[in-house]
Curated annotation (Swiss-Prot):
GO molecular function, one term: DNA binding
Superkingdom per UniProt: Bacteria
PANTHER family per UniProt: SUGAR FERMENTATION STIMULATION PROTEIN A
Family from the record: Belongs to the SfsA family.
Protein's UniProt name: Sugar fermentation stimulation protein homolog
Length: 229
């Protein structure tokens, strides 16, 4: 996925709340939008090099969107809207071997009390996919979530119901960076999510994790990595 808007560099100063932060741009302290409500405390540290997408649009409080951040030499995409777009694009292009062969690819489709990111249909065969973006990395291991997620637990429960009704169900952890050894649930932050994920897997819900090739104006699906439950 190519980011077509201009990208500029900055230095992270501080986070004000879930949606706003200050970044130094050309020596000026500037308000920017943070497109991720996660904690990101390991990434958004004072002095970190960041990349901002410039979105000129009426009604915006600031034209600057905090799109990427460097953690050492590792470039991480932090926009929480990106994983769905990248994975949907990859399925449509036939890149994802695990989800090839479906005639109809739809996004944001409801099932029960949840709305899943992707619905695939091939005749009578139906597959629901929930995509979770992963930005937390510890010693080369990707983890999710970085904060307790009631919504994430709810999605896993609904995916179990999908499977029980005879359809295919999958949760995909899209790791918004490269050079990852494996993925594992973050039991330290949300032990219940880890329990639900393991239960879902034992009941037939498919669990996948993929890394991404991340550049200063693009992010593309790269490799499937091991999931350690």
């Amino acid at each position: 996925m190519i980011i077509k808007n201009p990208i500029i560099k900055g230095k992270f100063i501080e986070r004000l709340n879930r949606f706003e932060a200050y970044v130094e741009i050309d020596g000026i302290k500037t308000l920017v939008h943070v497109p991720n409500t996660g904690r990101l405390k390991e990434i958004l540290v004072k002095g970190a090099d960041v990349l901002l997408e410039v979105r000129e649009k009426k009604g915006r409080k600031t034209p600057y969107e905090l799109a990427f951040a460097y953690k050492g030499k590792r470039l991480i995409s932090i926009d929480s809207q990106v994983p769905n777009k990248v994975f949907l694009e990859s399925i449509k292009k036939g890149i994802v071997e695990e989800f090839r062969g479906y005639e109809l690819v739809e996004k944001e489709k409801s099932f029960g009390n949840s709305k899943f990111d992707i619905k695939l249909t091939n005749g009578k065969e139906i597959c629901y996919i929930e995509v979770k973006g992963v930005t937390l990395e510890v010693d080369g291991v990707a983890k999710f979530p970085d904060a307790p997620t009631e919504r994430g637990r709810k999605h896993l429960k609904e995916l179990i119901k999908v499977k029980e009704e005879g359809m295919r169900a999958a949760v995909v952890f899209l790791i918004q960076m490269d050079d990852i050894k494996y993925f594992t649930p973050n039991d330290e932050q949300d032990p219940q999510f880890g329990q639900f994920l393991r239960e879902a897997f034992t009941k037939g819900v498919e669990v996948y994790a993929y890394t991404c090739d991340v550049g200063e104006n693009f992010i593309n699906l790269k490799n499937r990595v091991q999931v350690v439950l």
